[in-house]
Regions:
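Residue-level marker of beta-strand positions
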Residues: 10, 121, 151-152
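Short beta-strand His + acidic residue motifs that chelate non-heme Fe in jelly-roll/DSBH
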Residues: 15, 122-124, 143, 161-167
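A short glycine-rich, His/Asp/Glu-containing loop-to-beta-strand
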Residues: 87-120
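Glycine- and acidic-residue-biased ligand/ion/polar-headgroup-sensing regions
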Residues: 117-120, 127-142
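Short acidic-glycine-tyrosine-enriched beta hairpin
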Residues: 142-162
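Double-stranded beta-helix
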Residues: 174-199
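Positively biased amphipathic helices and basic secretion/translocation or surface-docking motifs
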Residues: 6-9, 13, 20-86
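Ligand-binding loop in jelly-roll beta-barrel domains
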Residues: 159-183
Length: 199
């Protein structure tokens, strides 16, 4: 969601409005009991060394991963913290589709970058679990519509589709999967070999 918000002004405004509403609702709540050591904890946090602007800029610099510098500079800054510490291993799933799993320490979901070459198509597939996708670069279409940079979509079991990148450029997406995809048609014989890499 944070990645989508980086692309969508309207959604950022909506989140800001919801944060303001939440603050207003908190002012109407009854006072809560506070722990005896809350003041000491707060003062300790205030005394802790603060990160400087240079530290923040360094943390958000272009990731030092196996992404090409051109693509890395276009990724949302939120993703840089995951990509700075690892080499991405791109695997070819078809002649026009590659995937690179991103290790985030999660065991129930896989976070990955998917790249469909310009004019390329992913195999027709269903979903064994939930798939959340944000388009980071380029665009693709499927049976339900066209998705451009910043667009967010969700697929569930029974949602069969075949993403196709536009002819003018490759499409890079960030996806979160709760289970591997399920190939359909003649390629379904490959399903036992589909890897799922939550980490």
């Amino acid at each position: 969601i944070t990645t989508h918000l980086q692309f969508c002004d309207q959604c950022r405004e909506a989140v800001s409005g919801l944060n303001i509403l939440g603050g207003e609702l908190l002012t109407e709540c009854d006072e809560a009991e506070l722990s005896d050591d809350l003041l000491a904890q707060t003062l300790a946090m205030l005394d802790a060394p603060m990160a400087t602007n240079k530290d923040a800029e360094a943390a958000a610099e272009t990731p030092k991963s196996s992404l090409c510098p051109d693509l890395a500079s276009q990724l949302p800054k939120y993703l840089h913290r995951f990509l700075n510490s690892q080499e991405l291993e791109w695997r070819s799933l078809s002649s026009t589709l590659s995937v690179a799993a991103i290790s985030v320490g999660e065991t129930d979901y896989e976070l990955a970058l998917h790249r469909i070459d310009a004019g390329g198509k992913a195999p027709v597939h269903d979903h064994k679990g939930t798939e959340l996708t944000v388009v980071l670069k380029g665009s693709f279409s499927d049976e339900d519509g066209i998705y451009r940079e910043g667009d967010f979509l969700m697929r569930e079991p029974g949602d069969i589709h075949r993403p196709s990148a536009t002819q003018d450029q490759a499409c890079i997406c960030l996806s979160v999967l709760s289970a591997p995809i399920k190939l359909t048609g003649i390629k379904q014989v490959l399903n036992p070999f589909m890897r799922f890499n939550p980490s």
